[in-house]
A protein has these predicted regions:
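Conserved beta-strand segments of alpha/beta enzyme cores
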Residues: 3-5, 52, 79, 114, ...
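Short catalytic-loop micro-motif centered on adjacent basic/acidic residues
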Residues: 28-30, 55-58, 131-133
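Residue-level marker for buried hydrophobic side chains located in beta-strands
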Residues: 27, 57, 80, 152-153, ...
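Short Gly/Pro-enriched turn/cap motifs at secondary-structure boundaries
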Residues: 7-8, 111-113, 133-135
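Metallo-beta-lactamase
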Residues: 33-34, 51, 127-213
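Active-site HxH/HxHxD metal-binding segment of metal-dependent hydrolases
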Residues: 34-123, 206-210
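Conserved beta-strand hairpin/beta-sheet module of binuclear metal-dependent hydrolase folds
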Residues: 1-49, 143-155
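Short beta-strand or tight-loop elements
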Residues: 2, 112, 118-120, 125-130, ...
C-alpha cells in the first residue's frame, strides 16, 4: 500500500507529495516549500514516520515546484531528478525567483542529480514509478505513474477541470499531445496534480474540455 502525504506550499499553493510504503523508503515529489514552516513540516513528517528518503523528483523545472530542494539536499543529501528538457529552467532557479515570483533567495540550489529518460522506472521500497514524458507546460515536463496503486502525479500538465499554462516556456501543441497520452491511463486512475485537488482520468475525460481520446 502506498502512503501519500500532501503538503500545500508557497505563495501559489503548490502541492508537494511525500510517498512511502511499508519499507519506510520514501520519495519526495515537487518540493515547493518556500517558507521555513513548510520546510520544517516536511522534514518533521519524515522524521516522525521514520522514513528514509531515496529520491527527490520534480515534475518540471518551475521554481514553485523546487523552492525547497536545498533543504532536502541539506537534510538527506538528495539532488533533484527532472526531465532533460527542463535543464535550463533548473540552472536558472534564482533568476525565476526574481523575474517570475518577485522574491529574492539567499541560498544556492543543488545541481540536478539525474535527468529522466521517457518510460524510465524509478524504484523505492516495493513500488515503482514510471516516468511518462508530458511536455507542454514546460519542454521537459513529466508525469510519475504508479501502476500498482493506479495513481499519477501530473505536475502542472493536468489539473482538475483545467491544464497548465503554456506561456512560460511551454507549447499548447505539446501539452495537448501530452494530455492524449495521459488519457490512455485507466479511467479510475487518481490524478494528483501540482495545484488544487485530486481528480481521476475518467472525470477529466468527462468534464475537462482539453481532454479526449
Amino acid at each position: 500500500m502506498l502512503n501519500i502525504q500532501r503538503f500545500v506550499c508557497n505563495m501559489i499553493r503548490e502541492n508537494c507529495y511525500v510517498i512511502s510504503d511499508s519499507s519506510k523508503e520514501c520519495v519526495i515529489i515537487d518540493c515547493g516549500a518556500y517558507y521555513e514552516e513548510e520546510r520544517r513540516a516536511i522534514v518533521d513528517y519524515i522524521a516522525k514516520e521514520t522514513l528514509k528518503p531515496v529520491h527527490l523528483l520534480a515534475t518540471h523545472g518551475h521554481l514553485d515546484h523546487n523552492f525547497g530542494n536545498n533543504t532536502i539536499f541539506e537534510e538527506f543529501s538528495l539532488k533533484p531528478e527532472v526531465g532533460y528538457g527542463d535543464r535550463e529552467f533548473m540552472k536558472n532557479l534564482k533568476g525565476q525567483a526574481k523575474d517570475t515570483f518577485g522574491v529574492e533567495v539567499d541560498y544556492d540550489f543543488p545541481p540536478v542529480g539525474h535527468f529522466f529518460e521517457d518510460e524510465e522506472v524509478i524504484t523505492f521500497g516495493t513500488h515503482e514509478l514510471k516516468v511518462i514524458s508530458t511536455p507542454g507546460h514546460t519542454p521537459g515536463g513529466v508525469t510519475f505513474y504508479c501502476e500498482d496503486e493506479n495513481v499519477a502525479f501530473t505536475g502542472d500538465t493536468l489539473f482538475k477541470g483545467s491544464i497548465g499554462r503554456t506561456d512560460l516556456g511551454g507549447s499548447m501543441f505539446m501539452i495537448i499531445n501530452s494530455l492524449r497520452e495521459l488519457a490512455q491511463l485507466p479511467d479510475d486512475t487518481t490524478v494528483l496534480s501540482g495545484h488544487g485537488e485530486s481528480t481521476t482520468i475518467g472525470d477529466e475525460l468527462a468534464h475537462n474540455p482539453y481532454m479526449d481520446r
